[in-house]
């Protein structure tokens, strides 16, 4: 009788353990519904997606919350040195200064390497594909024939950005002397509109939101060896165990896309939606 009792006890313990391990999947969603609010983390100063004036991600966050029958509690936060830092601070642990974590974080790169390095989060539901583009003045460059068409002319980029790294290193630095660094891509694009620059290298979304189909400017894809031509997808992230929340958000996003609401959100900010 001794060994059967041990096996029985072991079976009960494993069953209890399984219940304990599976509980958080619904416990997170239950807790959120009890609170009445969906806490959504968005980056600060990332126009046109999120800024003091709102943005695409802010509108998506509001639409997702409404789909789930909840109020929106927005948590804007400054970007860390790496996306992994942001996932730790805003998704699974919280910041040492006392804010976070949120229920879900938006604008997370849907990348296999990032997923592999961050096993405490679930990255899912890509909703946009970002790319780098060159905006240029047709007056300054009446005939565009690649990036070399702007050689010797001033080109604006945002500080500490992919565009800045690419342009400063292109062609052994042949554009370096004419690169102008700006606090944000929006400011660079505003100077392009004012005739102070010949071109701006920036994210496609940034360019579209500022230029708004202005016929005086062209937008072109420029090939860089260190940049994938297809760009990168962005989506959401929740805690790994929050499976019910992830499923609910995935379903809500699918409904927003099918109804055309996602397209309308992007259109309000002058950006063409690009499905990942």
Protein language model regions, located:
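Ligand-binding cleft/hinge of the Venus flytrap
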Residues: 62, 66-71, 75-76, 125-128, ...
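Extended ligand-binding regions for polar small-molecule ligands
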Residues: 58-67, 138-141, 148, 153-154, ...
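Short loop->beta-strand "edge-of-pocket" segments that line small-molecule binding or catalytic clefts
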Residues: 37-44, 145-163
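A ligand-binding cleft/hinge motif common to bilobed small-molecule-binding domains
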Residues: 104-117, 166-170, 193-194, 198-230
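Extracytoplasmic small-molecule ligand-binding "clamshell" domains
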Residues: 30-103
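Periplasmic-binding protein-like
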Residues: 43, 128-133, 204, 212-253, ...
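N-terminal signal peptide c-region/cleavage motif recognized by signal peptidases
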Residues: 18-23
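Acidic, polar ligand-binding/catalytic clefts
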Residues: 75-148
């Amino acid at each position: 009788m001794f060994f059967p009792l041990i096996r029985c006890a072991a079976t009960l313990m494993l069953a209890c353990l399984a219940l304990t391990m599976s509980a958080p999947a619904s416990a997170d969603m239950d807790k959120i519904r009890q609170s009445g609010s969906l806490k959504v983390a968005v980056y600060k100063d990332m126009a046109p997606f999120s800024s003091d004036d709102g943005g695409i991600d802010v509108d998506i966050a509001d639409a997702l919350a409404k789909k789930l029958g909840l109020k929106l509690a927005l948590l804007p936060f400054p970007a860390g040195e790496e996306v992994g830092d942001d996932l730790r601070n805003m998704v699974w642990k919280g910041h040492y200064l006392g804010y976070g974590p949120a229920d879900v974080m938006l604008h997370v790169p849907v990348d296999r390497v990032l997923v592999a390095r961050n096993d405490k989060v679930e990255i899912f539901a890509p909703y946009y594909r970002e790319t780098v583009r060159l905006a240029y003045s047709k007056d300054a460059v009446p005939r565009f024939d690649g990036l070399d068409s702007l050689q010797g002319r001033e080109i604006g980029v945002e500080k500490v950005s992919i565009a800045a790294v690419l342009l400063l290193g292109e062609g052994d630095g042949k554009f370096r002397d004419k690169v102008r660094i700006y606090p944000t891509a929006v400011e660079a694009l505003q100077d392009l509109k004012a005739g102070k620059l010949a071109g701006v290298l920036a994210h496609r979304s940034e360019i579209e939101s500022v230029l708004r189909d202005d016929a005086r400017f062209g937008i072109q894809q420029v090939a860089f060896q260190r940049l994938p031509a297809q760009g990168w997808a962005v989506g959401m992230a929740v805690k790994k165990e929050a499976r019910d929340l992830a499923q609910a958000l995935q379903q809500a996003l699918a409904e927003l896309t099918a109804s055309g609401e996602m397209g309308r959100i992007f259109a309000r900010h002058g950006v063409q939606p690009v499905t990942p």
